[in-house]
Protein backbone atom coordinates (compact mmCIF):
# COMPACT_ATOMS: atom_id res chain seq x y z
CA UNK A 1 0.00 0.00 0.00
CA UNK A 2 1.26 3.46 -0.94
CA UNK A 3 2.18 5.56 2.10
CA UNK A 4 1.30 9.11 1.03
CA UNK A 5 2.45 10.74 4.28
CA UNK A 6 5.91 9.21 3.94
CA UNK A 7 6.24 10.56 0.40
CA UNK A 8 5.36 14.09 1.57
CA UNK A 9 7.94 13.86 4.35
CA UNK A 10 10.61 13.08 1.81
CA UNK A 11 9.72 16.02 -0.42
CA UNK A 12 12.11 18.85 0.36
CA UNK A 13 10.65 22.26 1.10
CA UNK A 14 11.52 24.68 -1.68
CA UNK A 15 13.80 27.47 -0.57
CA UNK A 16 13.74 31.02 -1.85
CA UNK A 17 16.28 31.83 -4.53
CA UNK A 18 18.85 34.56 -3.74
CA UNK A 19 20.19 36.54 -6.68
CA UNK A 20 23.11 38.96 -6.96
CA UNK A 21 21.85 41.93 -9.00
CA UNK A 22 24.86 43.98 -10.07
CA UNK A 23 27.13 45.75 -9.37
CA UNK A 24 26.20 47.72 -12.47
CA UNK A 25 28.54 49.82 -14.56
CA UNK A 26 28.80 53.44 -13.28
CA UNK A 27 27.02 54.62 -16.46
CA UNK A 28 24.00 52.44 -15.60
CA UNK A 29 22.53 54.10 -12.48
CA UNK A 30 25.87 53.97 -10.73
CA UNK A 31 27.59 51.04 -9.06
CA UNK A 32 24.40 49.53 -7.65
CA UNK A 33 24.44 46.09 -6.08
CA UNK A 34 21.26 44.41 -4.85
CA UNK A 35 20.73 41.11 -3.06
CA UNK A 36 17.33 40.01 -4.37
CA UNK A 37 15.43 37.20 -2.67
CA UNK A 38 12.95 35.56 -5.03
CA UNK A 39 10.09 33.14 -4.67
CA UNK A 40 9.80 31.90 -8.24
CA UNK A 41 9.77 35.19 -10.22
CA UNK A 42 8.27 37.21 -7.36
CA UNK A 43 10.43 39.50 -5.23
CA UNK A 44 10.39 38.73 -1.50
CA UNK A 45 13.17 41.08 -0.40
CA UNK A 46 15.60 43.57 -1.94
CA UNK A 47 18.71 44.52 0.01
CA UNK A 48 20.78 47.37 -1.49
CA UNK A 49 24.54 47.24 -0.88
CA UNK A 50 26.05 50.70 -1.12
CA UNK A 51 29.51 52.23 -0.73
CA UNK A 52 31.16 51.05 -3.94
CA UNK A 53 31.52 54.69 -5.08
CA UNK A 54 32.37 56.10 -1.64
CA UNK A 55 35.14 58.70 -1.88
CA UNK A 56 34.94 60.31 1.56
CA UNK A 57 33.66 63.61 0.18
CA UNK A 58 32.51 65.03 3.53
CA UNK A 59 35.91 64.34 5.10
CA UNK A 60 37.82 65.70 2.10
CA UNK A 61 35.87 68.98 2.34
CA UNK A 62 37.15 69.48 5.90
CA UNK A 63 40.68 69.78 4.50
CA UNK A 64 39.81 72.34 1.82
CA UNK A 65 39.02 76.04 1.95
CA UNK A 66 35.43 77.09 1.31
CA UNK A 67 36.30 77.93 -2.30
CA UNK A 68 38.31 74.76 -2.93
CA UNK A 69 35.43 72.61 -1.63
CA UNK A 70 32.99 73.81 -4.30
CA UNK A 71 34.01 71.40 -7.12
CA UNK A 72 33.18 68.39 -4.92
CA UNK A 73 29.50 69.26 -5.26
CA UNK A 74 29.63 68.89 -9.05
CA UNK A 75 30.73 65.31 -8.51
CA UNK A 76 27.95 64.14 -6.19
CA UNK A 77 24.89 63.88 -8.41
CA UNK A 78 26.86 64.31 -11.62
CA UNK A 79 23.63 64.76 -13.60
CA UNK A 80 22.46 67.78 -11.55
CA UNK A 81 25.70 69.69 -11.13
CA UNK A 82 24.66 73.34 -10.88
CA UNK A 83 21.85 72.73 -8.39
CA UNK A 84 24.32 71.32 -5.87
CA UNK A 85 26.73 74.21 -6.43
CA UNK A 86 23.72 76.45 -5.79
CA UNK A 87 23.03 74.76 -2.44
CA UNK A 88 26.66 75.01 -1.28
CA UNK A 89 26.98 78.65 -2.37
CA UNK A 90 23.81 79.57 -0.46
CA UNK A 91 25.13 77.78 2.65
CA UNK A 92 28.47 79.64 2.57
CA UNK A 93 26.77 82.98 1.88
CA UNK A 94 24.38 82.58 4.80
CA UNK A 95 27.21 81.61 7.15
CA UNK A 96 29.34 84.57 6.09
CA UNK A 97 26.66 87.25 5.74
CA UNK A 98 25.11 86.31 9.11
CA UNK A 99 28.45 87.21 10.72
CA UNK A 100 28.42 90.75 9.29
CA UNK A 101 26.73 93.68 10.98
CA UNK A 102 25.60 95.09 7.63
CA UNK A 103 22.93 93.54 5.40
CA UNK A 104 24.12 92.48 1.97
CA UNK A 105 22.18 90.84 -0.83
CA UNK A 106 23.41 88.93 -3.85
CA UNK A 107 23.15 91.12 -7.00
CA UNK A 108 19.90 90.69 -8.91
CA UNK A 109 21.59 89.67 -12.15
CA UNK A 110 23.52 86.93 -10.33
CA UNK A 111 20.27 85.60 -8.81
CA UNK A 112 18.59 85.43 -12.21
CA UNK A 113 21.57 83.65 -13.79
CA UNK A 114 21.56 81.14 -10.91
CA UNK A 115 17.86 80.40 -11.39
CA UNK A 116 18.35 80.16 -15.15
CA UNK A 117 21.08 77.53 -14.90
CA UNK A 118 19.43 75.65 -12.04
CA UNK A 119 16.39 75.13 -14.28
CA UNK A 120 18.55 74.19 -17.26
CA UNK A 121 20.09 71.59 -14.92
CA UNK A 122 16.61 70.35 -13.94
CA UNK A 123 15.77 69.78 -17.61
CA UNK A 124 19.14 68.03 -18.09
CA UNK A 125 18.38 65.69 -15.19
CA UNK A 126 14.81 64.91 -16.23
CA UNK A 127 15.89 64.16 -19.80
CA UNK A 128 18.36 61.65 -18.40
CA UNK A 129 15.86 60.24 -15.87
CA UNK A 130 12.92 59.72 -18.22
CA UNK A 131 14.75 58.52 -21.33
CA UNK A 132 17.20 56.13 -19.61
CA UNK A 133 14.20 54.78 -17.69
CA UNK A 134 12.50 54.16 -21.03
CA UNK A 135 15.67 52.52 -22.36
CA UNK A 136 15.86 50.23 -19.30
CA UNK A 137 12.32 49.07 -20.03
CA UNK A 138 13.07 48.58 -23.74
CA UNK A 139 12.23 51.84 -25.55
CA UNK A 140 15.42 53.14 -27.18
CA UNK A 141 14.10 55.90 -29.49
CA UNK A 142 13.23 58.52 -26.78
CA UNK A 143 16.80 58.26 -25.47
CA UNK A 144 18.28 59.00 -28.90
CA UNK A 145 15.88 61.88 -29.58
CA UNK A 146 16.26 63.56 -26.19
CA UNK A 147 20.04 63.24 -25.93
CA UNK A 148 20.37 65.32 -29.08
CA UNK A 149 18.58 68.09 -27.14
CA UNK A 150 20.60 67.41 -24.00
CA UNK A 151 23.77 68.05 -25.97
CA UNK A 152 22.56 71.59 -26.68
CA UNK A 153 22.09 72.22 -22.95
CA UNK A 154 25.60 70.94 -22.25
CA UNK A 155 26.88 73.48 -24.77
CA UNK A 156 25.27 76.28 -22.71
CA UNK A 157 27.24 75.00 -19.70
CA UNK A 158 30.41 75.04 -21.79
CA UNK A 159 29.82 78.56 -23.09
CA UNK A 160 29.44 80.11 -19.63
CA UNK A 161 32.10 78.14 -17.74
CA UNK A 162 34.34 76.31 -20.20
CA UNK A 163 33.27 72.91 -18.82
CA UNK A 164 30.48 70.66 -20.03
CA UNK A 165 29.79 68.92 -16.72
CA UNK A 166 31.83 70.02 -13.71
CA UNK A 167 31.31 73.73 -14.24
CA UNK A 168 31.98 75.25 -10.77
CA UNK A 169 29.94 78.14 -12.16
CA UNK A 170 27.64 79.10 -9.27
CA UNK A 171 29.94 80.33 -6.49
CA UNK A 172 29.54 81.97 -3.07
CA UNK A 173 28.61 85.59 -3.66
CA UNK A 174 27.26 85.18 -7.20
CA UNK A 175 28.48 83.40 -10.33
CA UNK A 176 31.96 82.93 -11.80
CA UNK A 177 31.46 84.72 -15.14
CA UNK A 178 28.89 86.86 -16.86
CA UNK A 179 26.80 85.43 -19.70
CA UNK A 180 28.62 85.48 -23.06
CA UNK A 181 27.21 87.37 -26.02
CA UNK A 182 24.10 85.92 -27.73
CA UNK A 183 23.62 83.06 -25.27
CA UNK A 184 20.28 84.46 -24.07
CA UNK A 185 18.88 84.37 -27.61
CA UNK A 186 20.17 80.82 -28.12
CA UNK A 187 18.60 79.60 -24.85
CA UNK A 188 15.29 81.20 -25.84
CA UNK A 189 15.40 79.46 -29.25
CA UNK A 190 16.12 76.17 -27.49
CA UNK A 191 13.08 76.60 -25.19
CA UNK A 192 10.76 77.12 -28.18
CA UNK A 193 12.20 74.19 -30.11
CA UNK A 194 12.44 71.78 -27.15
CA UNK A 195 8.77 72.18 -26.27
CA UNK A 196 7.92 70.63 -29.65
CA UNK A 197 10.41 67.81 -29.14
CA UNK A 198 8.99 67.15 -25.67
CA UNK A 199 5.50 66.79 -27.16
CA UNK A 200 6.84 64.22 -29.65
CA UNK A 201 8.45 62.18 -26.84
CA UNK A 202 5.19 62.37 -24.87
CA UNK A 203 3.22 61.12 -27.88
CA UNK A 204 5.61 58.20 -28.15
CA UNK A 205 5.39 57.11 -24.50
CA UNK A 206 2.37 58.43 -22.61
CA UNK A 207 -0.24 56.32 -24.43
CA UNK A 208 2.12 53.52 -25.41
CA UNK A 209 0.45 50.25 -24.38
CA UNK A 210 3.66 48.38 -23.51
CA UNK A 211 5.13 51.35 -21.61
CA UNK A 212 1.97 51.66 -19.50
CA UNK A 213 1.87 47.92 -18.80
CA UNK A 214 5.42 48.08 -17.46
CA UNK A 215 4.83 51.17 -15.25
CA UNK A 216 1.18 51.43 -14.13
CA UNK A 217 0.61 49.90 -10.65
CA UNK A 218 4.34 49.20 -10.26
CA UNK A 219 5.97 50.62 -7.12
CA UNK A 220 2.89 52.17 -5.52
CA UNK A 221 3.81 54.39 -2.55
CA UNK A 222 1.17 55.90 -0.25
CA UNK A 223 1.49 59.42 1.15
CA UNK A 224 2.15 57.98 4.62
CA UNK A 225 4.89 55.66 3.34
CA UNK A 226 6.50 58.49 1.35
CA UNK A 227 6.68 60.69 4.46
CA UNK A 228 7.89 57.86 6.72
CA UNK A 229 10.74 57.01 4.36
CA UNK A 230 11.73 60.66 3.89
CA UNK A 231 10.92 60.76 0.18
CA UNK A 232 11.06 64.16 -1.54
CA UNK A 233 10.80 65.41 -5.11
CA UNK A 234 8.69 63.46 -7.63
CA UNK A 235 8.48 60.45 -5.29
CA UNK A 236 6.72 62.60 -2.68
CA UNK A 237 4.68 64.80 -5.02
CA UNK A 238 3.45 61.68 -6.81
CA UNK A 239 1.53 60.84 -3.63
CA UNK A 240 -0.38 64.12 -3.87
CA UNK A 241 1.71 66.03 -1.30
CA UNK A 242 2.34 69.62 -2.37
CA UNK A 243 5.95 70.16 -1.34
CA UNK A 244 8.49 72.02 -3.43
CA UNK A 245 11.26 73.97 -1.70
CA UNK A 246 11.20 76.60 -4.45
CA UNK A 247 7.65 77.42 -3.28
CA UNK A 248 7.68 76.38 0.39
CA UNK A 249 11.07 77.90 1.29
CA UNK A 250 11.98 80.19 -1.65
CA UNK A 251 15.60 81.11 -2.30
CA UNK A 252 17.13 83.50 -4.86
CA UNK A 253 13.72 85.07 -5.56
CA UNK A 254 12.03 81.84 -6.73
CA UNK A 255 8.84 83.23 -5.16
CA UNK A 256 8.76 85.86 -7.94
CA UNK A 257 8.51 83.24 -10.70
CA UNK A 258 5.20 81.88 -11.92
CA UNK A 259 5.17 78.08 -12.06
CA UNK A 260 3.06 75.17 -10.83
CA UNK A 261 3.91 72.33 -8.46
CA UNK A 262 3.06 69.13 -10.33
CA UNK A 263 1.47 66.45 -8.14
CA UNK A 264 -0.06 63.03 -8.78
CA UNK A 265 -2.76 60.86 -7.24
CA UNK A 266 -1.69 57.22 -7.64
CA UNK A 267 1.98 57.26 -6.73
CA UNK A 268 3.17 54.56 -9.12
CA UNK A 269 6.02 54.51 -11.66
CA UNK A 270 3.81 55.88 -14.44
CA UNK A 271 2.65 58.81 -12.28
CA UNK A 272 6.25 59.73 -11.47
CA UNK A 273 7.16 59.60 -15.16
CA UNK A 274 4.29 62.01 -15.97
CA UNK A 275 5.41 64.35 -13.15
CA UNK A 276 8.96 64.55 -14.50
CA UNK A 277 7.70 65.23 -18.02
CA UNK A 278 5.40 68.02 -16.82
CA UNK A 279 8.12 69.48 -14.60
CA UNK A 280 10.23 70.00 -17.71
CA UNK A 281 7.48 72.24 -19.12
CA UNK A 282 7.47 74.22 -15.86
CA UNK A 283 11.27 74.58 -15.98
CA UNK A 284 11.04 75.88 -19.54
CA UNK A 285 8.52 78.48 -18.33
CA UNK A 286 10.89 79.57 -15.53
CA UNK A 287 13.80 79.78 -18.01
CA UNK A 288 11.72 82.10 -20.21
CA UNK A 289 10.85 84.30 -17.23
CA UNK A 290 14.50 84.40 -16.11
CA UNK A 291 15.59 85.52 -19.58
CA UNK A 292 12.99 88.29 -19.46
CA UNK A 293 14.22 89.32 -15.98
CA UNK A 294 17.86 89.68 -17.02
CA UNK A 295 19.07 93.24 -16.48
CA UNK A 296 22.57 94.74 -16.66
CA UNK A 297 24.39 94.66 -13.33
CA UNK A 298 26.94 92.96 -11.13
CA UNK A 299 27.34 89.19 -11.24
CA UNK A 300 28.82 88.86 -7.72
CA UNK A 301 29.20 90.76 -4.48
CA UNK A 302 32.05 93.25 -4.45
CA UNK A 303 34.20 94.34 -1.52
CA UNK A 304 33.62 91.16 0.52
CA UNK A 305 35.99 88.31 1.30
CA UNK A 306 33.89 85.50 -0.19
CA UNK A 307 34.35 86.64 -3.81
CA UNK A 308 37.57 86.77 -5.81
CA UNK A 309 38.91 90.09 -7.12
CA UNK A 310 37.89 90.90 -10.68
CA UNK A 311 40.30 89.45 -13.24
CA UNK A 312 40.30 92.74 -15.14
CA UNK A 313 42.29 94.32 -12.28
CA UNK A 314 44.60 91.36 -11.64
CA UNK A 315 46.80 92.14 -14.67
CA UNK A 316 46.95 95.87 -13.89
CA UNK A 317 47.18 96.15 -10.09
CA UNK A 318 49.71 94.29 -7.90
CA UNK A 319 47.43 94.45 -4.84
CA UNK A 320 44.62 92.77 -6.78
CA UNK A 321 47.04 90.13 -8.06
CA UNK A 322 48.17 89.30 -4.51
CA UNK A 323 44.58 89.22 -3.21
CA UNK A 324 43.53 86.97 -6.09
CA UNK A 325 46.33 84.50 -5.30
CA UNK A 326 45.60 84.51 -1.56
CA UNK A 327 41.86 84.05 -2.16
CA UNK A 328 42.38 80.73 -3.94
CA UNK A 329 45.36 79.50 -1.90
CA UNK A 330 44.45 80.59 1.65
CA UNK A 331 40.71 81.23 1.38
CA UNK A 332 38.62 83.42 3.67
CA UNK A 333 37.76 83.03 7.36
CA UNK A 334 34.17 82.60 8.53
CA UNK A 335 33.39 83.20 12.24
CA UNK A 336 32.05 80.27 14.28
CA UNK A 337 28.51 79.58 13.14
CA UNK A 338 26.36 76.83 11.64
CA UNK A 339 23.38 76.49 9.32
CA UNK A 340 21.38 74.00 7.29
CA UNK A 341 20.50 74.95 3.72
CA UNK A 342 18.09 73.14 1.41
CA UNK A 343 17.31 73.50 -2.29
CA UNK A 344 14.90 71.72 -4.62
CA UNK A 345 17.19 69.45 -6.63
CA UNK A 346 15.67 67.53 -9.57
CA UNK A 347 15.65 64.34 -7.48
CA UNK A 348 14.27 65.95 -4.30
CA UNK A 349 15.47 67.88 -1.27
CA UNK A 350 19.23 68.40 -1.32
CA UNK A 351 20.53 69.69 2.01
CA UNK A 352 23.87 70.90 3.38
CA UNK A 353 24.73 71.33 7.06
CA UNK A 354 27.77 73.59 7.32
CA UNK A 355 29.69 74.31 10.54
CA UNK A 356 32.30 77.09 10.66
CA UNK A 357 34.93 77.47 13.41
CA UNK A 358 36.83 80.74 12.81
CA UNK A 359 39.09 79.21 10.16
CA UNK A 360 39.20 79.20 6.37
CA UNK A 361 38.03 75.58 6.22
CA UNK A 362 34.67 74.06 7.21
CA UNK A 363 34.76 72.23 10.54
CA UNK A 364 31.99 69.92 9.33
CA UNK A 365 30.01 69.57 6.11
CA UNK A 366 27.12 67.11 6.20
CA UNK A 367 25.41 66.36 2.89
CA UNK A 368 21.82 65.14 2.72
CA UNK A 369 21.20 63.54 -0.67
CA UNK A 370 17.64 62.61 -1.75
CA UNK A 371 18.80 59.42 -3.48
CA UNK A 372 20.13 57.96 -0.21
CA UNK A 373 16.67 58.14 1.36
CA UNK A 374 14.90 56.94 -1.78
CA UNK A 375 17.11 53.85 -1.99
CA UNK A 376 15.97 52.83 1.52
CA UNK A 377 12.45 52.49 0.11
CA UNK A 378 13.41 50.18 -2.75
CA UNK A 379 12.67 47.05 -0.70
CA UNK A 380 9.21 48.35 0.23
CA UNK A 381 8.46 49.33 -3.38
CA UNK A 382 9.71 46.02 -4.86
CA UNK A 383 7.86 43.53 -2.66
CA UNK A 384 5.47 41.18 -4.50
CA UNK A 385 6.56 42.49 -7.90
CA UNK A 386 8.36 40.50 -10.58
CA UNK A 387 12.13 40.53 -10.96
CA UNK A 388 11.77 42.46 -14.25
CA UNK A 389 9.94 45.21 -12.35
CA UNK A 390 12.99 45.88 -10.15
CA UNK A 391 14.64 47.46 -13.21
CA UNK A 392 11.58 49.70 -13.64
CA UNK A 393 11.74 50.73 -9.97
CA UNK A 394 15.43 51.63 -10.12
CA UNK A 395 14.58 53.87 -13.07
CA UNK A 396 11.60 55.51 -11.37
CA UNK A 397 13.73 56.36 -8.31
CA UNK A 398 16.25 58.16 -10.56
CA UNK A 399 19.23 56.92 -8.54
CA UNK A 400 22.73 58.33 -9.08
CA UNK A 401 25.35 56.82 -6.80
CA UNK A 402 27.67 59.80 -6.71
CA UNK A 403 25.31 61.42 -4.19
CA UNK A 404 24.28 58.17 -2.45
CA UNK A 405 27.81 56.96 -1.64
CA UNK A 406 29.49 60.38 -1.50
From Swiss-Prot:
MF (Gene Ontology): NAD binding; NADH dehydrogenase (ubiquinone) activity; quinone binding
One of the protein's GO biological processes: mitochondrial electron transport, NADH to ubiquinone
Gene3D superfamilies linked: Cytochrome-c3 Hydrogenase, chain B (1.10.645.10)
Record-linked InterPro entries: NADH_Q_OxRdtase_suD, NADH_UbQ_OxRdtase_49kDa_CS, NDH1_su_D/H, NiFe-Hase_large
Enzyme Commission no: 7.1.1.2
Signal peptide: none
Name under which the protein is recorded: NADH-ubiquinone oxidoreductase 49 kDa subunit
Enzyme class: translocase
Alphabetized Pfam families for the sequence: Complex1_49kDa (PF00346)
Family, per entry: Belongs to the complex I 49 kDa subunit family.
Recorded topology in the membrane: Peripheral membrane protein
Gene Ontology cellular-component annotations: mitochondrial inner membrane
Key words, A-Z: Electron transport, Membrane, Mitochondrion, Mitochondrion inner membrane, NAD, Oxidoreductase, Respiratory chain, Translocase, Transport, Ubiquinone
Function summary: Core subunit of the mitochondrial membrane respiratory chain NADH dehydrogenase (Complex I) that is believed to belong to the minimal assembly required for catalysis. Complex I functions in the transfer of electrons from NADH to the respiratory chain. The immediate electron acceptor for the enzyme is believed to be ubiquinone.
